[in-house]
Design a protein with these regions (language model features):
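Pyridoxal 5′-phosphate
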Residues: 1-365
């Protein structure tokens, strides 16, 4: 990415004026246009009201957001549900499996609480067994009692990728559910080629939208198995039929029930800003910056957690919370991982080599 387009992008993201923002793995930087879309939509609703015209805007905004998320994933809009978070999507699809006592779900030992929470609820409510193994071993851990695999596509701890080829084979027989919080908008996904039953993602991380948005891709091959547990007005093809109303045959049957027009518009605006750059360039530059940082750190004698080619990198430090605070004081935003010896760095297409140097200056001081 040449300097002029990069600077133009950075000018649209006000936090970058003073801050080396390296934390899209938590929340990406908000663009002025995203903030304006949220504010303008809310103001318009306040002034004009939320009558029939508002709901026409809402339907249009949902369609726009669905299309934007689908493009980011490399999917068809009809296969993408709109959710409020990665966890929201995970909860919806796990509940749809209708598992029974004695059934087993395989996951990994380094999962985010956003997946562990729904899995724990599933265990406590349904009596299923949750079996956790290292991410690299999840496919090999599948046994006779396994009814699903639910794991990260990209680990939130170190940027490791799941064993995609092996899980593709597993997915021929049982549903594979990916937590794509660190995948959607960070790397090329193409969920259909992954052979998974469902792929969840977040709108506020690598897609730089407001907190409160996410997506759930659902495979058409698993439509008969993944039946939504809770339905609301927007999930029904003909709501006027009351108890006889059927859900939409496409992914809309999994939509969250209350995503406002202004939120959807803001999320679409954020995602389209990245799409205008070109997703191939977004993915290549984001991972390339992490690769450059890893090389520099290793040459300087620092220990970097094993990772794959993703925009996430975790470096070992003696006191991660203290280092995170030192970096914050210097205008460098990263995060530490509770209970782990790392600070985690997330590099996005919007970052510059100077952002990395500011990080290195504090680490080596």
């Amino acid at each position: 990415m040449s300097s002029e387009p990069l600077q133009d992008l950075r000018n649209r993201l006000p936090v970058l004026a003073q801050t080396a923002y390296l934390n899209a793995g938590t929340c990406g930087p908000l663009a002025w246009a995203t903030a304006d879309a949220l504010a303008d939509g809310t103001s318009r609703a306040a002034v004009v009201g939320r009558g029939p015209a508002y709901f026409e805007v809402l339907v249009s905004a949902h369609a726009r957001l669905r299309a934007a998320y689908a493009e980011a994933l490399g999917a068809e809009p009809a296969d993408v549900a709109l959710t409020t978070s990665t966890t929201d999507g995970l909860g919806r699809v796990l509940a749809s499996l209708r598992l029974q006592p004695g059934d087993e779900v395989v996951t990994s030992t380094d999962e985010h609480p956003g997946l562990l929470g729904p899995l724990a609820a599933l265990r406590n409510l349904s009596g299923v067994t949750i079996r956790a193994v290292p991410l690299a071993d999840v496919a090999d851990a599948v046994g006779p009692a396994t009814r699903a695999v639910a794991c990260s596509h990209v680990s939130w701890v170190n940027g490791e990728r799941a064993p995609e080829a092996a899980l593709r084979e597993v997915g021929r027989d049982i549903p594979v559910i990916y937590d794509g919080a660190q995948g959607a908008g960070a790397i090329a996904v193409d969920p259909a080629s992954l052979g998974c039953a469902a792929y969840t993602g977040a709108g506020q991380k690598w897609l730089c939208g407001p907190v409160g948005l996410g997506m759930l891709w659902v495979s058409r091959d698993w439509a008969d198995t993944l039946r939504p547990f809770a339905l609301s007005y927007g999930n029904l093809a003909e709501p006027a039929r009351g108890l006889d109303a059927e859900p939409w045959p496409d992914a809309r049957r999994f939509d969250a029930s209350a995503i406002s027009a202004e939120m959807a518009s803001a999320g679409a605006t954020a995602t389209e800003l990245l799409a205008d750059i070109g997703w191939d360039q977004v993915f290549a530059r984001s991972a390339g910056l992490a690769d450059l940082l890893e090389q520099t750190l290793r040459e300087g004698g620092y220990e970097v957690a094993p990772r794959d080619r993703t925009p996430l990198l975790s470096v070992v430090t003696p006191d991660p919370p203290a280092m995170r605070a030192r970096l914050a004081d210097a205008g460098v935003v990263v995060r530490d991982l509770p209970g782990r010896p790392y600070i985690r760095v997330s590099t996005g297409v919007w970052n510059s080599e100077q952002d990395l140097q500011r990080l290195l200056d504090v680490l080596t001081a």
